[in-house]
Amino acid sequence: MKHFHLKVKEVIEETSDAVTISFWHPLSEMIKYQAGQFLTILLTIDSEKVRRSYSMSSSPHTDTAPAVTVKRVPGGLVSNWLIDHVKEGDFLEVLEPMGHFQVLPDARNVRTVVLIGAGSGITPLMSIAKSVLKVETESRVVLLYGNRAEEGIIFKKQLDEMSRAYGNRFNVYHSLTQPSNDWKGGLGRLDKSMIVATLEEIGGVKETTTEYFLCGPDGLMETTKEALLAWGVAEERIHRESFATATTHPVHEADEDDDSLKMQEIKVRYEGEEYTFNVAPHQTILEAALELDIDLPYSCQAGMCTACMGKCTSGKVLLDEEDGLTKSELAQGYILTCVAHPLTKGVVIEIE
């Protein structure tokens, strides 16, 4: 996995609690990425090594400088540090862009792309919108975007400018839960009825070529997915990205004679090396590796970003969280080490 030390080109204040950080490309090569992917930033804060993934708000098709947008999280170690300390000319260590939540625009496409998000969930959706509108000149983009108040709408000015520039090819629908008296947009939280009613009012978004991309709080994405499925949208056309961060993994139930309650020796093959180590009951494979200073790839530690994806070629594992993988990937034996527990003896994981 490639590491880069990127020089900060500019820090732009989007709202009172969100900034966009753009970077110069390294002299040796261009940073390559797809619309919707994320960048993982590696920092040392108060002697603690930390890493966080931030979706790229720039588009590889419209922006010369790669950029991420960071929203302040109350009590959040990394988001607060980045917003309070990073300035033009600083260098940040990052991993190469990653993530399956992406769009590969094709000039031959004629379709509708529906984007539904809230708060900082707009970040990858912005990248997707700019890319599709630029490359697919016959396609249309629809954005449903929920926020608390107008002053908290990230990219408000850019979205307005894009609406004017692209006309009926870019339809933006804002909804606020705490609007001002002069607000003329939508009111209330994006719920099932509002989402379906808005899409029906727009019209032309139910064709089999339409793709749906969701990003925001888990509750919103679950609600939206349920609404779309009930509305008749095929599940394979619904794509989602979560901004989850590491949490305590739930303990899975097991019988006393279940091997999952025993220390398991496993093997992990990565970058030409084979590591053999023990994983304690209720410990994830990644947690065990990091305790031994085995430098496996990872980012979110919540089973969503897929940076730690590997393939289980022997034995069985249990995943605390499966939403980060497709059904096809699960069927092929792919796992995420940050949420994976060995269930049997002889577990072997191969990481590309």
Task: Give the label of every model feature segment.
Residues N80-D258, E265-K267:
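FNR/FR-type flavoprotein reductase catalytic core
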Residues A288-L292, A307-E352:
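Iron-sulfur (Fe-S) cluster-binding segments and ferredoxin-like electron-carrier domains
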Residues K2-L95, R108-R111, S139, N147-E150, ...:
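Ferredoxin-reductase
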Residues M1, K7, E13, D17, ...:
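Iron-sulfur (Fe-S) cluster-binding modules
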Residues H174, G216, T224, S242, ...:
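Active-site proximal loops enriched in glycine and acidic residues that flank catalytic Cys/His/Asp
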Residues P60-T64, D106-N109, E136, P342-E352:
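Ligand-binding loop in jelly-roll beta-barrel domains
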Residues L261-M304:
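C-terminal accessory/binding modules appended to enzymatic or scaffolding proteins
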